[in-house]
UniProtKB/Swiss-Prot annotation:
Keyword Iron: no
Catalysed reactions, semicolon-separated: 5-dehydro-4-deoxy-D-glucarate + H(+) = 2,5-dioxopentanoate + CO2 + H2O
UniProt enzyme class: lyase
Taxonomic source organism: Rhodococcus opacus (strain B4)
Designated name of the protein: Probable 5-dehydro-4-deoxyglucarate dehydratase
Keyword Magnesium: no
Lineage, opening ranks: Bacteria, Bacillati, Actinomycetota, Actinomycetes, Mycobacteriales
GO molecular function: 4-hydroxy-tetrahydrodipicolinate synthase activity; 5-dehydro-4-deoxyglucarate dehydratase activity
EC number(s) per entry: 4.2.1.41
Family: Belongs to the DapA family.
Pathway the protein takes part in: Carbohydrate acid metabolism; D-glucarate degradation; 2,5-dioxopentanoate from D-glucarate: step 2/2
Pfam family, one: DHDPS
GO biological process: D-glucarate catabolic process
Length: 304
């Protein structure tokens, strides 16, 4: 059981690599809880600093709120002792508040607040949204800046001042100037998480901006390689990092970019390659075809 404060949990998250497991489905797209639980146990053999259940890689956007709670509860119960499990909240403010409360009831150790659904919002609106979610839970909240919820440094500073349990900022934009402004303004008040697809591509320059960790989707199917990459990054072994980028990460991203939505689909394909299948992706995503799967298998062989 974890009894640490939100700030202590955020510090732990920032000290190592973050696991973002896929969500397992049966052939009819139902949640396969038994397979999911088994996989959380398998991932627990490797040294991640946090587990983000039902996040983007876990197809949050295709899960119902009750399914999200079911996934989070399973992750909490199967994760190794001492490993923080972070749950998602999203959609409109009322739903996000409900999801944050449900996550806390399920035993989660923190909240990742994803962008609101299907609408643009002003900075004032985004600030109000985050404040309501933070007020609804005692858990630490990390905001995910991306898509229709890109937070300015002024908005993040206001939230950091107003919400003691705002503990993290996850960047899914890739705007170096914006990230520099936020880090320069807030320093170690927050834990900074890299959240662009295949975050390993951006890890080297982002480390200089205080982004000490990131969501590793490839950790799902090449966990040791993902950890070796992260440890090389943090120890300053840039030669290893560059070789790994050229040997695996860049060609992997080329394959990922062949179709929209493959950032998630390719992860489940990777699990199929290593004989740990997680089932299909739910529509509207599509699975890789046989040729693409073979290409991915060749890449995985290089780093396994």
């Amino acid at each position: 059981m974890i009894t640490a404060s939100p700030q202590e949990i955020a510090h732990k998250l920032g000290s190592g690599l973050l696991s973002f497991p896929v969500t397992h489905f049966t052939d009819d797209h139902s949640f396969d809880e038994a397979a999911y639980r088994e996989n959380i146990g398998w991932l627990g053999q490797f040294d991640a600093s946090g587990l983000f259940a039902a996040g983007g890689t876990g197809e949050f956007f295709s899960l119902t709120p009750p399914e999200v709670e079911q996934v989070v509860r399973a992750a909490v119960q199967e994760a190794p002792d001492g490993l923080p499990v972070i749950a998602p909240a999203g959609y409109g403010t009322a739903t996000a508040v409900q999801m944050a409360r449900s996550a806390e009831s399920a035993g989660a150790h923190g909240i990742l607040l994803l962008p609101p659904y299907l609408t643009e919002a002003s900075q004032d609106g985004l600030v109000a949204h985050v404040k309501e979610v933070c007020a609804a839970t005692t858990l630490g909240v990390t905001i995910y800046s991306r898509a229709n919820a890109v937070y300015t440094e002024a908005a993040v500073a206001e939230l950091a001042d107003s919400c003691p349990n705002l503990v993290g900022f996850k960047d899914g934009v890739g705007n170096i100037e914006q990230m520099t402004r936020i880090y320069a303004s807030l320093g170690d008040r927050l834990t900074y998480v890299g959240g662009l697809p295949t975050a390993e591509m951006f890890a080297l320059p982002y480390l200089a901006l205080g982004v000490t960790t990131y969501s590793s989707a490839i950790y799902n199917f090449v966990p040791q390689f993902a950890l070796d990459f992260y440890n090389a990054l943090r120890s300053g072994d840039n030669a290893f990092v560059v070789n790994a980028l050229n040997d695996f990460v860049i060609p992997y991203c080329n394959l990922r970019n062949k179709k929209q939505g493959y950032a998630v689909s390719i992860i489940k394909a990777g699990m199929k390659v290593i004989d740990r299948p997680a089932g299909p992706v739910r529509p509207p995503l599509t699975d890789l075809d046989a040729v693409e799967l073979a290409e991915l298998a060749d890449l995985i062989k290089k780093v396994s």
